[in-house]
Amino acid sequence: MATRIENKKLSKSSSAWMKEHIDDHYVQKAQKDGYRARAAYKLLEINEKTNLIKKGMTVVDLGSAPGSWSQVAGHLVGEKGILIASDILPMDTLPDVTFIQGDFREPEVFDRIMAEVGDRQVDVVLSDMAPNTAGNSAIDQPRMMYLCELAVDFALATLPEGGALIMKVFQGEGTQELRKQMQADFSKIRSIKPGASRPRSKEIFWIAIK
């Protein structure tokens, strides 16, 4: 059943966002193509440019809910690959995707993820994680940087040499410092702004090769 939203109860900014969302080309395309969110096209474009996710690979998707990146990555790795998704939020099941609900910082959850990896190696770590934004960069940016640091720590703990981290970043305070720190552990870091990212968005994606 559709949810009715009364415009009079929305602020001007919320109403503008809702109109932008409904009119968004990628939102409409995602609904048509069966993706859970428009973010799917960001990963599709990134992989078209980098060809990092391939058939038979093992991929871990951090902060996976609602699952659009898992949909894309699961298709890319194919039947012989492994896609492990994890989020503190619930996520509806997807074919050939192993979902582990919980905080990957916790040893129990981390161990469950690695148990699914088994004797394979993690080829790619994905992170489309973002905080619930307050619209205040002084609050939002530190929260985002913290999530980025968590993704980097996970990647360093799991990726072999040559493995890749694909991670969303908000451009702002702390990003250059984090990039400099990562250069000690990653041989190459590339930035991509996919076409599916809204022009006004501060988000970019880093592709880091260990």
From Swiss-Prot:
Keywords assigned by UniProt, alphabetized:
Cytoplasm, Methyltransferase, rRNA processing, S-adenosyl-L-methionine, Transferase
Where is it located? Cytoplasm
EC number of the protein: 2.1.1.166
Reactions listed under catalytic activity: uridine(2552) in 23S rRNA + S-adenosyl-L-methionine = 2'-O-methyluridine(2552) in 23S rRNA + S-adenosyl-L-homocysteine + H(+)
**GO CC annotation terms, alphabetical:** cytoplasm
Stretches assigned to coiled coil? none
Q: Detail which positions bind S-adenosyl-L-methionine.
A: 67, 69, 87, 103, 128
Q: What class of enzyme is it?
A: transferase
Q: Which domain of life is it from?
A: Bacteria
- Tell me the active site: 168 (proton acceptor)
Q: Name one GO molecular function term.
A: rRNA (uridine-2'-O-)-methyltransferase activity
Disulphide bonds in the chain:
none
Function, as annotated: Specifically methylates the uridine in position 2552 of 23S rRNA at the 2'-O position of the ribose in the fully assembled 50S ribosomal subunit.
- Write down the PANTHER family for this protein, in alphabetical order: RIBOSOMAL RNA METHYLTRANSFERASE (PTHR10920), RRNA METHYLTRANSFERASE 2, MITOCHONDRIAL (PTHR10920:SF18)
The family classification in the record reads: Belongs to the class I-like SAM-binding methyltransferase superfamily. RNA methyltransferase RlmE family.
Query: Under what name is this protein listed?
Result: Ribosomal RNA large subunit methyltransferase E
What organism is this sequence from? Psychrobacter cryohalolentis (strain ATCC BAA-1226 / DSM 17306 / VKM B-2378 / K5)
